[in-house]
């Protein structure tokens, strides 16, 4: 599986609505985890990021260019739903603050890092995924 398929698989497994299985949402999740096409899932991170950082990462590493004025689209289609599902959290600043940031929750980071990419097969036995789904 490639990284987009892995992201889509994770979003499906945690019960995200079909609308959040879109390319935009999958790329946003990968960018937040700082996963390029070559980076193993075990190296995923949960650093604080702005939507601008997400858009830049996607353009640089996946070749998909989004205009800066699409930040609100990312916020509405991905971030709100991800936050509601406890996949990500924000830093509590005002949304119009230049210091407003998002990051993947520690719990969901463990899910991503425990994805088995060996032999291009996603491991169905991701214990962290099972635990995450059972709590949310």
Which role fits each region the language model picked out?
Residues 1-48:
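Short alpha-helical segments that sit at the start of domains
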């Amino acid at each position: 599986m490639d990284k987009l398929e892995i992201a889509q698989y994770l979003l499906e497994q945690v019960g995200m609505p079909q609308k959040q299985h879109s390319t935009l949402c999958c790329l946003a999740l990968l960018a937040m985890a700082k996963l390029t096409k070559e980076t193993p899932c075990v190296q995923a991170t949960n650093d604080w990021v702005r939507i601008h950082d997400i858009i830049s990462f996607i353009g640089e590493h996946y070749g998909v260019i989004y205009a800066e004025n699409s930040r609100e689209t990312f916020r509405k289609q991905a971030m709100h739903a991800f936050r509601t599902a406890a996949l990500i959290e924000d830093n509590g600043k005002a949304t119009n603050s230049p210091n407003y940031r998002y990051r993947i929750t520690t719990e969901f980071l463990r899910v991503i890092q425990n994805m088995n990419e060996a032999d291009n097969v996603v491991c169905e036995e991701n214990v962290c995924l099972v635990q995450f789904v059972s709590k949310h």
